Amino acid sequence: MAAGGSTQQRRREMAAASAAAISGAGRCRLSKIGATRRPPPARVRVAVRLRPFVDGTAGASDPPCVRGMDSCSLEIANWRNHQETLKYQFDAFYGERSTQQDIYAGSVQPILRHLLEGQNASVLAYGPTGAGKTHTMLGSPEQPGVIPRALMDLLQLTREEGAEGRPWALSVTMSYLEIYQEKVLDLLDPASGDLVIREDCRGNILIPGLSQKPISSFADFERHFLPASRNRTVGATRLNQRSSRSHAVLLVKVDQRERLAPFRQREGKLYLIDLAGSEDNRRTGNKGLRLKESGAINTSLFVLGKVVDALNQGLPRVPYRDSKLTRLLQDSLGGSAHSILIANIAPERRFYLDTVSALNFAARSKEVINRPFTNESLQPHALGPVKLSQKELLGPPEAKRARGPEEEEIGSPEPMAAPASASQKLSPLQKLSSMDPAMLERLLSLDRLLASQGSQGAPLLSTPKRERMVLMKTVEEKDLEIERLKTKQKELEAKMLAQKAEEKENHCPTMLRPLSHRTVTGAKPLKKAVVMPLQLIQEQAASPNAEIHILKNKGRKRKLESLDALEPEEKAEDCWELQISPELLAHGRQKILDLLNEGSARDLRSLQRIGPKKAQLIVGWRELHGPFSQVEDLERVEGITGKQMESFLKANILGLAAGQRCGAS
């Protein structure tokens, strides 16, 4: 009893230690299937930078059209009423005396810490052409911009956090691309051609085939970035001698891997985006290729505005796919990134409309809500110890066993009764790491019950060996049953086909004969009557000696067209034809001619196909040229064509003939 109590105590202690040791692994396993920690929603932060007057600019002595009020607000003249000003409120405002360090430290540097938490961040430079976007992002050797400052600080952070002795190992990679005329081009590998933008099952935007360069120091970054920057497309316009003709995107990825259990891994992305500026082709003087480039830039920026409006209005469809720029910015606007928009504006009055447009876009963008999250997953090799322990539970290979057939069939209970190594006891509990302590206690009770039964010599039917054998036997039986069913189905199908063929032979012998021996037994065709205008009816009571015969039965024989064309049989077929007496036709013509020569315009309208206009034409022609000599002279009237004349005769002569026939009857 004492030994049994000590064994139970050891098992209880091992269960508690196992639950505490692998609780983190259970959480990581949940994160692998999408259970990520989500921080609260984050609004897109907007900063506005006012560049100084450019040297040599005409009208530099004039007062600027924009004026800063404090560190977060500015005002601009109202073009509708010059006595008023429009005020804008943003997260930050940097005047014309602000430096590159002020902008970086105030707006960009605070979001870098999110990368080490496995979250995404984005920095976008927006504004019209010549407003200083590229200077803000790249800068100069004397005044470095956002990109070199961010990379320098980020690499320093990764070196500190990934140093020896720290729980995480960090690595940094970079990619650099441009969107030129709706084509995604790799600036690190210009020969790669147009790349496609994809979306994985978790909604992450990726570009297959995009180059990724590992960097561990700022020197590594410069070695890759400087040659790639020279590959970006630039051109000269009237407003800017080095105008960016494409949108440039620098993607920096930070991978983190935990050195200790539960061996988690994180991935954070930093998007540094230099957007091309919107252009007014009337002022830039773009022609040819420059005009085509300007059209592509303005179109993508217009779609960007539509995306912002759709997000603010809560529309069910956000047009990310209408442009490759918005498709790539899906994480930055309304996605999972901490985003900062730097709107660059110019103080000159000639850029007033562009400045107002940029400020309105910035004001709409600050209403966009992003939902960042920490993307954690479990490293693949973290599941290795669990798999090894499961293999150990299956026992040694068959070749190393020296047991009889009875032991191999039933299994030995000794390994379950005696305490084994710690790994063998911990591995079953690792599967249950997500359960609460009460459930673990119940499983321990069941384990004790099974152990007590095993110690009494009862066969353990739940051993892995037994389970495999029973499962294999069940699978073999199911396979045999399936084969028998398939064979039986084929026999039934063959029998049904034979029955159908026999029924066709018995009930449809003519269908199985050759075509040349088939006999045509068609029914006698019905008589057909040709119904002419005014429903001409055959008068059965008419006298055979009558002067006018409207219908006459005319019989003629036709050959039946058989399928094989071999039967010489001929069938007589009766049909009805319309035959009008010449006297009736002459009488109808004369009556129409009298009406044309003597009738008024109202009388003429009683004729078919004659309306008020044609009646007036007939009366006028008759007054000028005299009476008609024949009905066909009606075609000489101006406005009556030959086709109209034929239609007139058919409609009126037959109608009058039928009317006279009915009157005679």
From Swiss-Prot:
UniProt function note: Kinesin family member that is involved in spindle formation and the movements of chromosomes during mitosis and meiosis. Binds to microtubules and to DNA. Plays a role in congression of laterally attached chromosomes in NDC80-depleted cells.
Cross-link (Glycyl lysine isopeptide (Lys-Gly) (interchain with G-Cter in SUMO2)): 465
Subcellular location: Nucleus; Cytoplasm, Cytoskeleton
GO cellular component: chromatin; cytoplasm; cytosol; kinesin complex; kinetochore; microtubule; mitotic spindle; nuclear speck
All residue ranges annotated as the Kinesin motor domain in the record: 43-368
Region Disordered, annotated ranges: 379-428
One GO MF term attached to the UniProt entry: DNA binding
Coiled coil feature spans: 465-508
InterPro entries on file: Hlx-hairpin-Hlx_DNA-bd_motif, Kinesin-like_fam, Kinesin_motor_CS, Kinesin_motor_dom, Kinesin_motor_dom_sf, P-loop_NTPase, RuvA_2-like
Quaternary context: Interacts with FAM83D. Interacts with SIAH1.
Keyword field contains Ribonucleoprotein: no
Residues at which ATP binds: 127-134
Record GO biological process: DNA repair; metaphase chromosome alignment; microtubule-based movement; mitotic cell cycle; mitotic metaphase chromosome alignment; sister chromatid cohesion
Domain of life: Eukaryota
Name of the gene this protein is made from: KIF22
Keyword field: ATP-binding, Coiled coil, Cytoplasm, Cytoskeleton, Disease variant, DNA-binding, Dwarfism, Isopeptide bond, Microtubule, Motor protein, Nucleotide-binding, Nucleus, Phosphoprotein, Ubl conjugation
Main location: nucleus
Associated pathology: Spondyloepimetaphyseal dysplasia with joint laxity, 2: A bone disease characterized by short stature, distinctive midface retrusion, progressive knee malalignment (genu valgum and/or varum), generalized ligamentous laxity, and mild spinal deformity. Intellectual development is not impaired.
Claim: Transmembrane is one of the keywords in the record: no
Residues bearing the modification Phosphoserine: 412, 427, 452, 543, 562, 581
Protein's UniProt name: Kinesin-like protein KIF22
